[in-house]
Structures are given as structure tokens and as C-alpha cells.
């Protein structure tokens, strides 16, 4: 890990721990070497920081292309391993760059909802990102962010103090999905993320949302669905 990246990581850890009371669980589920695809739900602009600050490896992630317009900010996010993606299109250049970095043995973070949640729930996922995992043969680690929607909903200009949880789930290894289509793999990962979120909301009932349809929940979680 580069010294400058390590410093930024340390700074983010301190700020998020104090202001957002951010806690990370399951970091050991991220393999220590080799290409890894982190698949996270998307609650706020801070999600790339929250999902990578606890890792002992540098994270790589897509960022909206309009964030690269300012040369100073561009230098910063490129140093932090961001690369541009055009939203609303099948950006082949971004897909190829993701695959290149995964094949180099890096950690790549993606938010397959494509946009921030409007209500805190995990929305439909885009299957194209799961096709990347199938083509590169890397493990997928589902990552849940919970509490950032309450701290920084879409209509709010700046984040409020919060109580944020980041959980890294058990990896989905290639042997578990090589026979699945990208759509089936997408649904498997989404259901895991929903189950992770549901478990935290059972422990922290003040966060409980209007829940998902019963057919969206794993069987053991149906008691919390509408």
C-alpha cells in the first residue's frame, strides 16, 4: 500500500469513526491477494470511502465521469484508484478497465444499483457488473452499508452525525457461480445483501424500513418481509 494512500485511509478512518461512528465487520472475508470484486449497496457519496477504508489492500472503483472535470480533484481521485464511467450507458471502456484491474489482482469496488437508494432499501441490480465477475473468474464479496441513508439521504446537502455499519459478507467463489447466468448471479448476491441488511435491522429496530416483498427475501428471513 502506497504511503499517500495509507495516509488518506488513516484520515478517513478517523473522521468516519468520530463523525459517523462507522464500524466494520467481516474484513477478513476479503481475500488477502488476487483479484476480488466487492459488490456493495449504494447509500451515499461516501460509500467508496466507507467500503475501502478498513481494507489492508488498495481499493479501485468507478466514479462518474463528471467528477474528473476539475484537474485537482481528478488528480486526487485518480491517486485513490478511481476511473471514470459514463452513467446511463454501457461504457465499454470502464468495463474493460475493471476487467484489466481484476486480472492484475486488484480489489475493484462496484455499486450495481447504479445510483444511490431513494429509501434505504436495496434496489434492483444491473447484471452487467456480474458478467465481469464471470469473465474474470474472481470471487465476489458482498458488502453491506447501513446507516448512511439516515445520515445522508439524497435530498440532504451534507451528512449528519450517524451510526454506520459496513459488513463484508462471505465470498461467492467462482465454483459457486460458473454455471449461473449473470442474472442468476445478480439475484443470488442481491438476496445475500438483503439478508445482511435484515439481520442488522432486527438487531437495531430503530432502523427498520418498510420491508421487501416475501419473494425477495431468503426463506429464513421471511418473518421480516411485508
Describe the role of every protein-language-model region.
Residues 3, 93-226:
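Non-catalytic C-terminal accessory region of glycerolipid acyltransferases
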Residues 4, 8-10, 17-18, 31-89, ...:
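Catalytic core of membrane glycerolipid acyltransferases/transacylases, capturing the structured
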Residues 17-25, 149-150:
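Short gly/ser/thr-rich secondary-structure transition/capping motifs
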Residues 21, 35, 163-165:
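A residue-level signal for beta-strand positions that form part of recognition/binding surfaces
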Residues 27, 41, 64, 88, ...:
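Generic beta-structure capping elements
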Residues 28, 90, 146:
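Residue-level "edge-of-site" marker
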Amino acid at each position: 500500500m502506497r504511503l499517500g494512500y495509507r495516509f488518506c485511509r488513516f484520515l478517513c478512518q478517523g473522521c468516519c469513526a468520530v463523525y459517523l461512528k462507522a464500524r466494520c465487520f467481516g474484513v477478513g472475508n476479503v481475500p488477502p491477494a488476487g483479484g476480488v470484486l466487492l459488490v456493495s449497496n449504494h447509500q451515499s457519496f461516501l460509500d467508496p470511502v466507507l467500503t475501502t477504508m478498513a481494507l489492508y489492500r488498495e481499493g479501485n472503483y468507478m466514479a462518474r465521469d463528471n467528477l474528473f472535470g476539475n484537474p485537482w480533484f481528478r488528480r486526487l481521485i485518480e491517486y485513490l484508484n478511481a476511473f471514470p464511467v459514463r452513467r446511463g450507458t454501457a461504457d465499454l471502456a470502464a468495463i474493460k478497465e475493471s476487467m484489466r484491474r481484476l486480472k492484475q489482482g486488484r480489489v475493484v469496488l462496484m455499486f450495481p444499483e447504479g445510483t444511490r437508494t431513494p429509501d434505504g432499501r436495496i434496489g434492483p441490480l444491473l447484471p452487467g457488473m456480474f458478467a465481469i465477475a464471470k469473465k474474470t473468474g474472481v470471487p465476489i464479496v458482498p458488502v453491506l452499508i447501513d446507516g448512511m441513508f439516515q445520515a445522508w439521504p439524497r435530498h440532504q446537502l451534507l451528512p449528519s452525525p450517524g451510526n454506520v455499519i459496513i459488513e463484508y459478507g462471505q465470498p461467492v467463489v467462482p465454483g459457486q457461480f460458473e454455471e449461473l447466468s449473470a442474472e442468476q448471479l445478480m439475484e443470488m448476491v442481491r438476496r445475500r445483501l438483503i439478508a445482511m441488511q435484515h439481520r442488522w435491522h432486527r438487531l437495531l429496530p430503530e432502523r427498520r424500513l418498510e420491508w421487501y416483498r416475501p419473494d425477495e427475501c431468503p426463506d429464513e428471513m421471511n418473518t421480516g418481509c411485508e
